[in-house]
Amino acid sequence: MNAIDLEGVEETGGIVAAPTTSLPESFGGSRNWDYRYCWLRDAALTLGALLEAGFTDEAMLWRDWLLRAVAGDPEDLQIMYGVDGARRLPEIELDHLPGYEGSLPVRVGNGAVSQLQHDVLGEVMDALSETREHDVDPDGFAWALQRALVGDLLEHWDQPDNGIWEIRGEPQQFTHSKAMVWVALDRAVRGVEEHGLEGDVERWREVRDQVRAEVLERGYDEERGTFVQHYGGTEVDASLLQLVAFGFIEGDDPRMLGTIRAIEEDLMRDGLVL
């Protein structure tokens, strides 16, 4: 837990992605980002790990931080916040600094804060559902938030987004993003069916099934026998492995087996996936 304690702030419950800024992805390169913020995706996955490991107090600190950070209009949901819940994180380049190993620019803030990333809602919905599954400190406001988030998602789930990789170019219809839309709706449906909570379950179930059918049709390349990074493409990426982890498809499904083989062939180097 020492690493988690280092990256978390006891006073707020927020968990930062990293305590550093502008460390380069490659020496001398320009992909030097500021990661001293709380990404909802990263923190949601951390919450699940904390619950599974039995660190319920730490998990509840983050859940409470989440509820405070995203309070208000669900349309204003951001993919990241400051550790204190700050929303304004403008990206600024500090030209007077030399950068680590000459890697420029040095950045403060992160421009991805304004991106649309559909998958984040899936991870948040799954994380809050996990707290319910573990029967840890149930909170009626968490469900009210989930209902509001899903209601907003229904209005724009079919729009292209920047995806889990935070692409700074043209938004795409990313397969992983759409699968995580399914996750968000599925967890909402479960809240009603398995826990007796109130919600528009018929509408949620209808759109959930619609999204899944679309992903299986448009996010899958019949000729190659794999899911693809985005609709109309042929490349695979590592995020597709999460389709199994979140229950979108079984790991032994032939479509997933083909995807795994392609990822191993195209993206694996020395046992690591790029």
Per-segment meaning from a language model:
Residues M1-L274:
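Acidic, mature catalytic/reactive cores of soluble proteins
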